[in-house]
Structures are given as structure tokens and as C-alpha cells.
């Protein structure tokens, strides 16, 4: 029986993580979780899983939950999030929160020698050097939950990582993969939220449409697998059947395939190095699929992917700036305050405005994050 703490239980990854726990009640126990403002959902999860600690975003929601929570301790805010991440009984902390708020809980959980199931891209994007240094220092495993990084992780099992020639990350292309840049001037929030292959939260769905999601994944892959950016490629693959590939020095390429179902990489992170049945996921049927398509990625068409490569290669504090600018811009787009292509413009402005710090401390990263958010808000 593995004890799990789940950060971000009400989001897309969080709800699917609970599906995995539900499928294997003899294997996993939920000891703590966090939610944002979805209190009704939190009540249902408490009643089903009887965790010891639950964290909510707002203090005013604590009393509401205490009234129905029985023996579950209710905490709130950033301190509450840390309490969930540091639950003494938790062996695995699944970080499924959205945004850079996931950074500090991840670092503290690593220091407490918890195994980390990392679904929060922004943690490695904003502070990859700090996170990987901490993981090495405390001998902690970072197990990828993203389908692409899980695919690479699985392809590398038993392999000599020094023999990697290239990582090939696949991208569905998102909601607007077939639109020209001229057409993108007129797209709506509702258009952007209709992803062709995956069911995800609103922020990551917009990131998929701008291709920033893939850019974040490139930076994340750089840190997780220690591969230079020059050896990380992105290829358009509309069907989302091949989740990513690894090319080795002898030009052999290993790929991980499967139907699009996020529960598969989530479960693998929880069961690694073992596997368990996931009987209700769709079996891959290649002869029904017939043809798989691949296209070269155009970084002028998808400018956010280019920004991510530039930020990653620049290094230091630049990825944190790019990420903070993106979070603010995406939120403004979701609120219909800016157009779709303005997201790119705001990110570019923030990156051009920033003076890079080569090896920022945690405090500097948090300060830069806040300053970038203020700068972008002033531009809107």
C-alpha cells in the first residue's frame, strides 16, 4: 500500500489521479490533497477517501469543510499546500497544480525525501536547476506524469542514457493546428478550448493551442533527462498515438505508443517500476488507425515554441519570465480581455524587457515571477 499526497485534486490531472486510486484501492491510499475553490468537489473526495489533511485556497472555505469533514484536518493557503506536500505518511507526492505555485511545495517535498510525481511543468521550467540539484542531493526520484515525458522515461528503461542522440517530443498541434496565422486573429476562447485529442484543463488547453505547452515540455525534458536543447526536437503528430521517441547513437529509435489516456502515465508514475492493469482504457488498434501522420514543426507559425527554445537556451531566470508572462496572458485571454495572438506578443515583450540572472536563487525566482506578472498586467 502506497500513501499518496495529491496537490491539485480538482484539476484534470488530479481527477484522473483519483480515478487511478479508485481503480486500485488495495494499492493506494490518499492521505492528503489540496483543491482551489471547488469546495463541493472537495467534500465528495473527503467522503470517498477519508484523507487526514485537506488544503483549500481560501480561509473562508475552511469552516465550510470542517462542518462535513469528520476527522480530516482542514488547512488553507500556501502554508496549507506545504502541509499537504509534507504529510509525514506520504511516500509519493503528485504535483498536479497549475502554474508556478507548485514550485515551493515540490522543493520542500524533495527535501523531505518524498518521491515526486511531477505533472506541474512550471516547477522545472522556472527553477529546473534548483529542483534537480535538490533531487540529487536528497536522492529523490522525479517520476514524470506528462504523457510525453513518461514516454521518454519508459523508452529509457534499461538503456545507457549516455548513448542518447535525440529526444523527439510529439505534439498534436492543439485546437488550431490547421489554421493560418491570419485566421488566428479571429479565434475565440471557445474555439481554443476545443482540443481535438485530449481532455484537459482550460490553461493547458490554451497552452496547447499556442504551442507553449510543448515549449514548456521541451524545457522540462532538458532538466529531467539532462539533454541539450539542440538534441530535443518536436514533431507534429495529429493522432497523439506516439507519445514521444528516443533516438540513440546507432540511429535506433524507441517510441512509446498508446491511446490518448492520461491515466496511463499517471498510473505508471505511481506504480513504477511495476505496472498494473488499466482495463477500461482503450486498447490500441493499429489496423483500425491505419495511418499515422507527422509534420515538421514550424516555429514561425508557433512562435511560443520558439520563445521556449530561446528561453531555455538563454537559461538562468529567462524561463521563469516566459512562464509568468504566459500565465498572465493566458488568463487575460480566457477572460476575453485580449486576443489570441496577443498572448505571444505579451510574452515576447516580457522576455525582451528582462535582464537575465544566470543562476537565480529561489527568492530571486519568486521576485522575478511577481515582477513579470506586474509588468504584463500593465501592458494589458
Swiss-Prot record:
Binding positions for Mn(2+) per the UniProt entry: 146, 148, 217
The answer on whether this UniProt entry bears the keyword Disulfide bond reads: no
Q: Which reaction does it catalyse?
A: 2-C-methyl-D-erythritol 4-phosphate + NADP(+) = 1-deoxy-D-xylulose 5-phosphate + NADPH + H(+)
Q: What EC class is this?
A: oxidoreductase
> Which residues are listed for NADPH binding in this entry?
10-13, 36-38, 120, 122, 201
Q: Mind telling me which InterPro entries this protein's record contains?
A: DXP_reductoisomerase, DXP_reductoisomerase_C, DXP_reductoisomerase_N, DXPR_C, DXPR_C_sf, NAD(P)-bd_dom_sf
Q: What EC number(s) does the entry state?
A: 1.1.1.267
A molecular function annotated in GO for this UniProt entry is:
manganese ion binding
- What positions does the entry give for 1-deoxy-D-xylulose 5-phosphate binding? 121, 147-148, 172, 195, 208, 213-214, 217
Q: Which GO terms describe its biological process?
A: isopentenyl diphosphate biosynthetic process, methylerythritol 4-phosphate pathway involved in terpenoid biosynthetic process
Q: What does this protein do?
A: Catalyzes the NADPH-dependent rearrangement and reduction of 1-deoxy-D-xylulose-5-phosphate (DXP) to 2-C-methyl-D-erythritol 4-phosphate (MEP).
In which family does this protein belong, per the annotation?
Belongs to the DXR family.
Q: What is this protein called?
A: 1-deoxy-D-xylulose 5-phosphate reductoisomerase
**Source species of the chain:** Bacillus cereus (strain AH187)
Amino acid at each position: 500500500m502506497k500513501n499518496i499526497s495529491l496537490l491539485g485534486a480538482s484539476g484534470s490531472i488530479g481527477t484522473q489521479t483519483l480515478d487511478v486510486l479508485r481503480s486500485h484501492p488495495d494499492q493506494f491510499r490518499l492521505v492528503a490533497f489540496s483543491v482551489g475553490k471547488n469546495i463541493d468537489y472537495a467534500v465528495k473526495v473527503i467522503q470517498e477517501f477519508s484523507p487526514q489533511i485537506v488544503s483549500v485556497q481560501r480561509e473562508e472555505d475552511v469552516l465550510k469543510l470542517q462542518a462535513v469533514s469528520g476527522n480530516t484536518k482542514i488547512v488553507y493557503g500556501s502554508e496549507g499546500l506545504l502541509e499537504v506536500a509534507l504529510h509525514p505518511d506520504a511516500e509519493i507526492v503528485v504535483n498536479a497544480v497549475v502554474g508556478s505555485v507548485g514550485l515551493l511545495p515540490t522543493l520542500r517535498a524533495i527535501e523531505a525525501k518524498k518521491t515526486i510525481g511531477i505533472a506541474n511543468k512550471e516547477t522545472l521550467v522556472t527553477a529546473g536547476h534548483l529542483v534537480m540539484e535538490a533531487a540529487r542531493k536528497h536522492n529523490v526520484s522525479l517520476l514524470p506524469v506528462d504523457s510525453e515525458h513518461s514516454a521518454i522515461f519508459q523508452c529509457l528503461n534499461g538503456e545507457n542514457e549516455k548513448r542518447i542522440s535525440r529526444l523527439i517530443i510529439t505534439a498534436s498541434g492543439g485546437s488550431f493546428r490547421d489554421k493560418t496565422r491570419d485566421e488566428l486573429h479571429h479565434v475565440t476562447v471557445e474555439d481554443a478550448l476545443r482540443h481535438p485529442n485530449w481532455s484537459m484543463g482550460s490553461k493547458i488547453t490554451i497552452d496547447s493551442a499556442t504551442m507553449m505547452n510543448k515549449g514548456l515540455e521541451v524545457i522540462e525534458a532538458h532538466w529531467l533527462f539532462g539533454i541539450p536543447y539542440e538534441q530535443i526536437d518536436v514533431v507534429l503528430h495529429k493522432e497523439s498515438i506516439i507519445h514521444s521517441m528516443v533516438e540513440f547513437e546507432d540511429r535506433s529509435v524507441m517510441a512509446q505508443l498508446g491511446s490518448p489516456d492520461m491515466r496511463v502515465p499517471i498510473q505508471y508514475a505511481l506504480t513504477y517500476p511495476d505496472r498494473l492493469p488499466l482495463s477500461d482504457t482503450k486498447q490500441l488498434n493499429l489496423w483500425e488507425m491505419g495511418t499515422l501522420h507527422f509534420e515538421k514543426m514550424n516555429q514561425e507559425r508557433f512562435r511560443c515554441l520558439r520563445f521556449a527554445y530561446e528561453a531555455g537556451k538563454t537559461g538562468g531566470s529567462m524561463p521563469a519570465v516566459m512562464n509568468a508572462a504566459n500565465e498572465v496572458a493566458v488568463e487575460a485571454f480566457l477572460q476575453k480581455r485580449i486576443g489570441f495572438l496577443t498572448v505571444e506578443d505579451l510574452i515576447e515583450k516580457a522576455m525582451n524587457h528582462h535582464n537575465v540572472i544566470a543562476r537565480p536563487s529561489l527568492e530571486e525566482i519568486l521576485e522575478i515571477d511577481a515582477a513579470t506578472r506586474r509588468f504584463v498586467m500593465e501592458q494589458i
